[in-house]
Amino acid sequence: MKEFLQVLKRFLPPYKKYLALTIVFNMLSALLNIFSFAALIPILQILFRTEGTGTATQLMPWSFDNLKDVISNNADYYVTQLIHSVGSTTTLLLIGLFLAFTTMLKTGAYFLSSATIIPMRTGIVRDIRNQLYRKITSLPLGFFSDERKGDIIARMTGDVGEVESSIMSSLDMLFKNPILIIFYFSALLFISWQLTLFTLIFVPIFGWFMGVVGRKLKQNSIKAQSLWSDTMSQVEETLGGLRIIKAFCAEDKMNERFDRINSSYRTAVQRVNIRQQLAHPMSEFLGTVLIIIVLWVGGVLVLDKQMLSGPTFIYYLVMLYSIINPLKEFSKAGYNIPKGLASVERIDKILKAEDTIKEPENPVHIKSFEHQIEFRHVSFKYGEQWVLKDINLVIEKGKTVALVGQSGSGKSTLVDLIPRYYDVQEGEVLIDGIDVRQLGIHDLRQLIGNVNQEAILFNDSFIGNITFGVENATMEQVEQAARIANAHDFIMQTEHGYDTNIGYRGGRLSGGQRQRVRIARAILKNPPILILDEATSALDTESERLVQDALERLMTSRTTVAIAHRLSTIKNANEICVLHEGRIVERGTHDELIALGGYYRRLHEMQS
């Protein structure tokens, strides 16, 4: 329960007004229920002509010292006067109408209590999803290198859905049932405190049975949600690798793997559901046992004519039965909540993940790039493995510096340090003499444009993708950017021109077309610093020519850091740096490095 209260403390404050209304309407519903069932006593007295009916000859003054006797006497007096005035039959009708009226008010209050909790339930779930999404977009790239996409998607969908179906669906029970239990229990104490105290002996025993099952349920739920993440990860990997799966005729192998994971998930869910289904029959059985015990003890009191009359005892039983239902629902919530808390733990792995790329407390705001980018004694490692070692490099404004080297030499990591996708462990990365860790992150990244090997586009129109991240761009500016990127002509050949949807990740376009749309996006942003990460790799000759032409236009008057796989694309760079095992081993122009006869020349000869 402590964990559950902590969850409510985190997410409930914005919805306090709905909570207050829910509590008020639940209290009203409980009071009306007590009063409506109290009408049963005079009805039973009239029907069965019980001893004591009509014995009250005058009203007793109100007093808290003997409140029970006052209420019993005065109610009997009014009923007696009513019988004398209109007769027993009409009195029964009037009491019945009173019962119907109070029941109508009670059901109205019940509806309002449920209606006011719905905005709270749906709002909290929305807030959790929003917090998750914002956290995902703010976390550094390093976090996602250690996490599977399918697992993250599972937490956004399956775990949030479990919180909604388990914890949020229990809010009504948890804010309604304790109020009903308190009011009904007070009524039971008022009717017969001796009989009520006797029934309390059995409550801890029943609660222990429920707790044993609930604790095991949470453990099983954590395992089930973890297996659901494995299932989603398998689906995500399959969708991303369908071409390879088909090329290697591995459909059967992947089907078997998925069936194995899916069957494990089914087994775990089955265990959770079976244990959860124990809630209703167990609470039903325990409630019946309690009623039987009270019937026996209370029946003895009635037969011996001690403390309770027959109609009052029946009213007591009605109230006891009324309290059993919220107790059963309360126990049901006790089974649901552990499942939800298991999902909250998994969600919190993202929400409470450390954001290592933090905004400086007093950021230096920079709106333009004036002089140079400098890597000063920069070293960087992933985990315990050093990827960059003592890098020293100065990139003057307006110059183009190319990075070459074999895969894993640290080229992409080096350029990722400029926009602070990662932070260095040793040394500094400076822009105009200011450490990038002192700059506002938004200001820093606004200075930089990226065109990568993987042309990442969104399921949107051409115009939506080109203007992504650029506010208030005019159509004229969009078209101009597309023309410079050699994209305008093929865009206009589509059905709706710039309003044509390009599909998931630009799937309706060729590789060269996707890359040119990315270049148009970078041109529209008009950044002073440009990072090109193997932007022409994996393209055919014609597409490469068009993309390279667009890149050369984009690079005009910009400071460019280019990672190149094909050395022919960087011959005109002002400086070429050759990286090997995390160090710059050679640097110079193309001609200088060829003349040097070292690592760069060997790479060049391999591609010739």
Whereabouts are the PLM-identified features?
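Membrane-integrated ABC transporters
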Residues: 1-40, 47-99, 105, 112-117, ...
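An intracellular "coupling" helix at the cytosolic face of ABC transporter transmembrane type-1 domains
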Residues: 13-17, 141-142, 158-167, 171, ...
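Transmembrane helices of ABC transporter permease
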Residues: 21-28, 172-222, 296-309, 325
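Hydrophobic alpha-helical transmembrane bundles that constitute the permease/transmembrane domains
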Residues: 27-35, 100-111, 163-166, 170-185, ...
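Juxtamembrane helix-loop junctions of ABC transporter transmembrane domains
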Residues: 33-41, 45, 52, 98-149, ...
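Hydrophobic/aromatic residues within transmembrane alpha-helices of membrane transport systems
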Residues: 44, 101, 132, 136, ...
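Helix-loop-helix
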Residues: 187-201, 275, 279-345, 350-351
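ABC-type nucleotide-binding domain
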Residues: 359-360, 366-608
